[in-house]
């Protein structure tokens, strides 16, 4: 029996989504023994805020050590939250499979009487770690107090329960994958808050020359998700931005057409650029690149660069 070692971070969410991946792979490859190996990353150990890390321009914050293990052949497949992956893979590695995306939206969880983002009272304390969400909240609701909130899902929920925050915003996918969908009070519509590029999707990364493992991983690949993700990540790459930039993107496919909406905001909420591009789904990469070029002409680079200063 062949053994395939699957590497992941050790958080509750990372393990939940990796176990989901392994269960799907076992359905396709019942004669293969899949083993999970947890790996600590810089993101797990560093206590700085994501704003501080964005200023440093850190890339691969959540994935570098896992990719190093993959290159060293200590693991065969790496499972990542796709939104955490830089838009370029290290030499010798590739994204070989993107399973079907779950809900890509952001989710709000609030205390009693704090269940809708638009209805939060003036001065309400809202917690998030994301630079993108902070920029959005300061633009959309400048009357709110935006507070930093880091830690795993359980830590963030506990912080809400302690009374330190009136509401928090998390990725809906994380709550769904950890079987806590019932905690969500509001799925924030992308028309209001665009998710991070790739949010809600997973990536299976392998060594480029490992054809056997690539075949194993590709068995759970979802083409529609791949098309949407390609547009979103080409948009991010075209902006020269990374996963900690104040950038949102959301692609939708309908009747063979892919519509991509992009958003870039100033961290202090004083300026927002939002635009849409559409085309045949086969041109998904070009759609993302064209939208990035359009937004660069409108000053997006200055907003992204300001976060690093």
From Swiss-Prot:
EC numbers: 2.5.1.61
One GO CC term on file: cytoplasm
Textual note on the cofactor: Binds 1 dipyrromethane group covalently.
Keyword line: Porphyrin biosynthesis, Transferase
One Gene Ontology term from the biological process aspect of the record: heme biosynthetic process
Pathway per the UniProt entry: Porphyrin-containing compound metabolism; protoporphyrin-IX biosynthesis; coproporphyrinogen-III from 5-aminolevulinate: step 2/4
EC class name: transferase
Catalytic activity, reaction form: 4 porphobilinogen + H2O = hydroxymethylbilane + 4 NH4(+)
MF GO annotations: hydroxymethylbilane synthase activity
Necessary cofactors: dipyrromethane
Modification S-(dipyrrolylmethanemethyl)cysteine occurs at: 243
Superkingdom of source: Bacteria
SUPFAM superfamilies (alphabetical): Periplasmic binding protein-like II, Porphobilinogen deaminase (hydroxymethylbilane synthase), C-terminal domain
More info: The porphobilinogen subunits are added to the dipyrromethane group.
Subunit structure: Monomer.
Described purpose of this protein according to its UniProt entry: Tetrapolymerization of the monopyrrole PBG into the hydroxymethylbilane pre-uroporphyrinogen in several discrete steps.
Entry similarity comment: Belongs to the HMBS family.
HAMAP family assigned: Porphobil_deam (MF_00260)
Alphabetical list of NCBIfam families matching this protein: hemC
Entry protein name: Porphobilinogen deaminase
Taxonomic source organism: Deinococcus radiodurans (strain ATCC 13939 / DSM 20539 / JCM 16871 / CCUG 27074 / LMG 4051 / NBRC 15346 / NCIMB 9279 / VKM B-1422 / R1)
